[in-house]
Amino acid sequence: MLIVGAGPAGLYGAYYAGFRGMSVALMDSLPEAGGQVTAMYPEKVIYDVAGFPAIRGRELVDALVTQAAQFDPTYLLDQQAAELAHEPDAVVVTSSQGHRVRARVVVITGGLGTFTPRPLPTGTGHLGRGLVYFVPKLDVYADQDVIVVGGGDSAFDWALALEPIARSVTLVHRRDRFRAHAATIERVEASRVEILTFSEVAAIHGEDRIEKVELVQTRTGDRHVRPAQAVVAALGFTADLGPLTRWGLTMARRHIAVDSTMFTGVDRVFAAGDITEYPGKVRLIATGFGEVATAVNNAAPVVDPAAKVFPGHSSGDSTAS
């Protein structure tokens, strides 16, 4: 089995395919396993993964890599899945580096594809000098005044994570309605994070590093300057599925349409996780785990016609086949 995408769903899929007795390779365009969690949110605390009241992104990825390692999957990192070709009893995927992988079945767990942070309209000259789009390490913000820009889950999660470490945290949003999870909003409102609505960053000042930030009140036009050493722009990102759009897949709202078995309609190609779309779809890490298990189980008879879809329940050291 070839799994395209080494994020949380892909890593769990590698474990589960190994559990079903398959050999597995994972291909990902990023240089490290973990997908968006590793690349953008390694320090963010995740609260909605079963069995973990709270776990940092990096720790979750480490646990998934360890879990998959017992079946020794092959990692093909820093290369994008580019071309798909069919053989009578297999598919061949060619990577952007020319690496050809022949597999009985492919499971696409590519998240949202290649993702690029939406830039802050002003202050891009300070990128890497106090302006960041994600927080790789929390401790570097100790005793700093931090401005977090945005109104979604990432903005609120970063504000909450930085609150006990930074000297001050200010959350700036251009509206008074937020897209973040209601429970997270309540936690931020109950913290010492200052929330400024109807506000935007007008300018960022400083020589080598950020020294102060100029904010504008969008309804009145009033401006004020406050000290800051860091700005976290959590404005979301744009996603691009790249070559996958040329694989003959049925697309639905920039996602891959699948049926209840996670089958894409393209022979020997399944998909799971955030990249998929079906009625009632909810994009969570937790649902991605269930979807990739469904995909692997339904792919098992494609790999081996003698295999059953339902593997039975795991216990002890037994392995399903």
Swiss-Prot record:
InterPro entries: FAD/NAD-bd_sf, FAD/NAD-binding_dom, Fd--NADP_Rdtase_type_2, Ferredoxin-NADP_redctase_2
EC code: 1.18.1.2
Binding-site residues for FAD, renumbered to this chain: D28, Q36, Y41, A81, F115, D274, S315
Domain of life, source organism: Bacteria
Catalytic reaction(s) noted: 2 reduced [2Fe-2S]-[ferredoxin] + NADP(+) + H(+) = 2 oxidized [2Fe-2S]-[ferredoxin] + NADPH
Keyword match NADP: yes
Cofactor mode of binding and number, as noted: Binds 1 FAD per subunit.
Keyword field: FAD, Flavoprotein, NADP, Oxidoreductase
This protein's record includes keyword DNA damage: no
Cofactor list: FAD
GO terms, molecular function: ferredoxin-NADP+ reductase activity; flavin adenine dinucleotide binding; NADP binding
Summary of subunit composition and partner proteins: Homodimer.
Family of this protein: Belongs to the ferredoxin--NADP reductase type 2 family.
Name assigned to this protein: Ferredoxin--NADP reductase
Annotated source species: Frankia alni (strain DSM 45986 / CECT 9034 / ACN14a)
